[in-house]
Amino acid sequence: MLGFNSKKQYDENIKNPPSDDSCPMVSALFSKNNNLGVNALSLAILDLIDRDQIKCDIDLDGSYDVGKKLTSEDMEVMKKITLRIANKGELKTSQTAAINLLKNMNKNKKFNLKAMAKQTNNSSVANKFEKDFDEFIKALKNENGYDGENYKDILESSKLTGKGKEIKKQWKSFQDYLKSKELTEKYPPQSVEENSMQILYGACFGIEKDALSIRQNNSNLTDFIDKDGYKLLNIIFNNALLNVSEKRKGDGIFYGVNDKYTIPGGG
């Protein structure tokens, strides 16, 4: 078991993810009610960028942070972040679903975030997004053997098992490592790939910018996160669900929608 206190002696294993659970599932374990929300889709897209299945072209120098409300400046920044779908080789069903969702939203393999954001104000696009999002979540659950209440030997009837509590503690220690300057300097990532992987896991806990601040910005993924790309994806996808014209009732679906942000302009 990994503890995290001043008396504990650490070795380089502290920098390794404690299990092979996927990023969306790790995020779900730390979320309220263990839900898979829109951030699961955003995390899947980050992973596809990291795997070079989605190319990322950013025409912007320096770091960028989105404020509490989207401004015209934010929209212009989004215009300078272009994604291009370049999927090659075998993909998981959920990865294919995520890519198809992006294609359907944008009617193209290449698009910038501003254009995608404005599309989500169109109710027909939003309705299609909801269906595609449901397909993505369904595929993700199937791949991970998760039915919303039970997951491996970690969750039973929506409650952490003894093993689950142990795993969660280990992930908490890894989370603490990701944002610890002292531990990161002592046990730094040894490659570009490991550096990106650690920052990707940081996104699972919403500390991706903290993790990046003490690591290198040396890949397409880290540059995307440096421009607040993860947060922007969540805002865009939340906006799509807010603009669904026919709200369903009684199906128990929870999206984790945050309505603080609105996308200016029509579809």
Describe these PLM feature segments.
Residues M1-G267:
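Acidic, Ser/Thr/Pro-rich intrinsically disordered cytosolic tails and loops
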